[in-house]
Amino acid sequence: MESTFSSPAEAALQREAGVPGQFTPPEDLDRVYELERVTKFVCDLGCQRVTLQFPDQLLGDAGAVAARLEEVTGAKMFILGDTAYGSCCVDVLGAEQAGAQALVHFGPACLSPPASQLPITFVLGQRPVALELCAKAFEAQNPDPTAPVVLLSEPACAHALEPLAMLLLPKYQDLLISRPALPLPVGSPSSQPESLERFGRCFPLNPGRRLEEYGAFYVGASQASSDSSLDPDLSRLLLGWTPGRPFFSCCPDTGQTQDQGAKAGRLRARRLYLIERARDARVVGLLAGTLGVARHREALAHLRKLTEAAGKRSYVLAVGKPTPAKLANFPEMDVFVLLACPLGALAPQPSGGFFRPVLTPCELEAACNPAWPPPGLAPHLTHYAELLPGSPFHVPLPPPESELWDTPDVSLISGELRPPPPWKSSDDTRCSALIPRPQLELAESSPAASFLSSRNWQGLEPRLGQTPVKEAVRGRRGIAIAYEDEGSS
């Protein structure tokens, strides 16, 4: 049955996916999905049940890949699709429900450490790269052969960085090649323990060198990309890269380059705006945006502690993948904070936008921790794990008696003076023998009461004695989808 408020039950079965599936010719499956390496991974572990996780755009090949792997390995394959939050994260919960002994992740990945010790391997794909065109573009944007530059790429172009570096190394000596921070096979020792791991990549820095000294040349961005559809992986790099250092992107198909400095400036300016909105907020909604990334529970407890120390009220919301329609059900929230992987937190927002700003945990940290950033260090972080104890960027909250809590602060949005946290403005009981008791004109300031008083409609009015008495009449019968007095359609 169909009505104004509901769709027929058959609509869910007839609905087509919004992303067209990819269908690879059978003779190219082994090359595109690296089935030889995946087969070795499964056979070395002796797995009998393996889950294959595909993003929406690769689900068209999922059946053929699973059938090929079952035929070669003899193991039972389970296909995972339509993940609850983001396909870039490993769906360890889905793998555990299937009783899998290993997981193979296909497509773009954030490479965040999973919350489970399940053996995992990644197949990032191999996008074609015009090496000669990219090498000429690099030389055009970097005329100084002594300037330090690091080669970056989107995950699908990582295979081309080594060949590209071979074309450039005779001329450029201070060239650093990044590689994806893939998990090592179980039981294998680390071959490069000195590598710096950041942004889901490993940087083999020489002793005494720092990543902040390098410019960047990114292979993977398209010339037609705009700010509204900026790839979240590129956004993560632009936010975290050292301000003032050159950052160029190169289209792997055409070799056209683009200076990303202006986009990086706009991203940082928006981050400063969101930090101001978080400082003005009194009620914060913490969105659980991942359950499969390591330390997500510890991060959630850290964010609740942050908001409490700043005198804000927080609520934890588990709504799955956030959409404007879902978040519109919580008008009491001033801002939302999405606890997700770096790519999920920086994913492009829907065209309509959210009615309240959606922040990352790093922006909430900057808004609520008066000791942030640490002296001499102003990193633009993108992953919540970098805020937790054990990270070099972790900054503990100052003690209650610290003067940092009393620093005057003026909102750059409203122009009003922000009050200190409520616990800071309470009476000092250390020497209160001769302090007169206040008049208590305002007993308590509640964010919930302030929000209720600002609403146009505050509920049904009693209007006692003003409503005429009437005899009770029979109401409507049935359920909301089809009352008895409504004709069936």
Swiss-Prot record:
Keywords, A to Z, come to: Acetylation, Iron, Iron-sulfur, Metal-binding, Phosphoprotein
Q: Does the keyword 4Fe-4S apply?
A: no
Give the highest taxon in the source lineage.
Answer: Eukaryota
GO annotations of cellular component type: 2-(3-amino-3-carboxypropyl)histidine synthase complex; protein-containing complex
Q: In which pathway does it act?
A: Protein modification; peptidyl-diphthamide biosynthesis
Q: Which residues carry this modification: Phosphothreonine?
A: 467
Co-factor remark: Binds 1 [4Fe-4S] cluster per subunit. The cluster facilitates the reduction of the catalytic iron-sulfur cluster in the DPH1 subunit.
Q: Which InterPro entries match?
A: DHP2, DPH1/DPH2, DPH1/DPH2_1, DPH1/DPH2_3
Q: Name one GO biological process term.
A: protein histidyl modification to diphthamide
Q: Which cofactors does this protein require?
A: [4Fe-4S] cluster
Task: Quote the record's binding site residues for [4Fe-4S] cluster.
Answer: 89, 110, 341
Q: Which residues carry this modification: N-acetylmethionine?
A: 1
Q: Which residues carry this modification: Phosphoserine?
A: 7, 446, 488
Gene Ontology terms, MF aspect: 2-(3-amino-3-carboxypropyl)histidine synthase activity; 4 iron, 4 sulfur cluster binding; metal ion binding
User: What family does the Swiss-Prot or TrEMBL record give for this protein?
Assistant: Belongs to the DPH1/DPH2 family. DPH2 subfamily.
- PANTHER family per the record? 2-(3-AMINO-3-CARBOXYPROPYL)HISTIDINE SYNTHASE SUBUNIT 2 (PTHR10762:SF2), DIPHTHAMIDE BIOSYNTHESIS PROTEIN (PTHR10762)
How is this protein organized at the quaternary level?
A: Component of the 2-(3-amino-3-carboxypropyl)histidine synthase complex composed of DPH1, DPH2, DPH3 and a NADH-dependent reductase. Interacts with DPH1.
NCBIfam families hit by this protein: diphth2_R (TIGR00322), DPH2 (TIGR00272)
Free-text function comment from the UniProt entry:
Required for the first step of diphthamide biosynthesis, a post-translational modification of histidine which occurs in elongation factor 2. DPH1 and DPH2 transfer a 3-amino-3-carboxypropyl (ACP) group from S-adenosyl-L-methionine (SAM) to a histidine residue, the reaction is assisted by a reduction system comprising DPH3 and a NADH-dependent reductase. Facilitates the reduction of the catalytic iron-sulfur cluster found in the DPH1 subunit.
- In Swiss-Prot or TrEMBL terms, this protein is called 2-(3-amino-3-carboxypropyl)histidine synthase subunit 2
Gene field: Dph2
